Amino acid sequence: MRRISRRDFVRSSIVCGIGASVMSCMAKIQNTGQKRTRYIAAYDTESPACLAACRKIVEVHKRFEMPATFFIVGKTLDANPGEYRQLLDHPLFEIATHTYSHQMLRDNDFCGSAVSMDERRKEIFKGKEAVERVFERPCIGLRPGCGFDNAFRGEPKVLELIREAGIQYVSSLLWGPDYSLPALLRDPFNYKAEGFPDIWELPGHGWHENLLKDHNQWGPRRLTLWPSPFPQAVPDGFCKTPEDEFEVNKVFLNRALETGNSFVSLIWHPWSLHKFDPDMQMLELTFTHVQRLGLRPCTYAQLYGQVSGIDRS
């Protein structure tokens, strides 16, 4: 058995808590060796209010030297192309598409029915084209509006459009079973079963943070599983402070490390983050915790490079 250092012991104690759970978490860290869980900060950038929010978000990322993926709706990008280019054209950031106008690419129990196949083609192709035109770099990733509880499984026609557009990964698994939240800590997989082994699914995890604060004004809804796989991450009510939100985030960050997940990425929306926490205190708390745990920051594109075998680092 590999000898564990004092530094690893201290880190294990922080992650797992003091007591018997420390030993089980230490054993997990020993078993995984030098493999480190990756962390991806990702933002669904989808509304006019996102531009001001992204200015604040970028400041925090640069201060922490924290990479990020921005999934941008094409219409949102086309409304302020120069401003977004100046703000996000930075080595830390990947820019991917969030479709062109946030229309549904398959049915979603909460967000509505899918548009026609012709409309889905436009959403995929125009969204990718907008990113590549504004940023003059390849766009290899797509996150569909709202996401789904079964990703794009069983949707070969949509996957064919995605392949035709040149998209290499999608991030569409953003809900738990039966459209529940939080989304589970799922690892990447490809669509070989649908006939598309070169297209990878890179899920998102945890809550859609806007729902934690009732920013969609849905009010009380049927959202959680019972019994919950993450009871500590189901608050008694809507979050009231940045610290409340951070405590929820911490559950997923800690669990991903404890269970040896390949990565963890929470589902964030700039407009909602800024409305709730204009000083971005939650980001600072979360990024500090990521660094304390020793998670390995990256972008979705970098994760795709690893899981697809393109990048062996």
What name fits each language-model region?
Residues L77, C146-T259:
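Active-site-adjacent pocket scaffolds in enzyme catalytic domains
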Residues H61, L142, I162:
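Conserved, mostly hydrophobic/aromatic
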Residues G33, L174, C239, E243-S313:
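C-terminal domain-boundary segment and adjacent tail
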Residues S24-R38:
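C-terminal segment of N-terminal export signals and the immediately downstream linker at the start
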Residues R2, D8-K28:
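N-terminal export signals
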Residues A41-L51:
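Active-site-adjacent substrate/metal-binding segments within catalytic domains
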Residues R38, F64-R153, S171-S180, F196-G219, ...:
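Metal-dependent polysaccharide deacetylase catalytic core of the NodB/CE4 family, i.e.
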Residues C54, V58, P81-R85, R121-K128, ...:
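Generic structural signal for well-ordered alpha-helices
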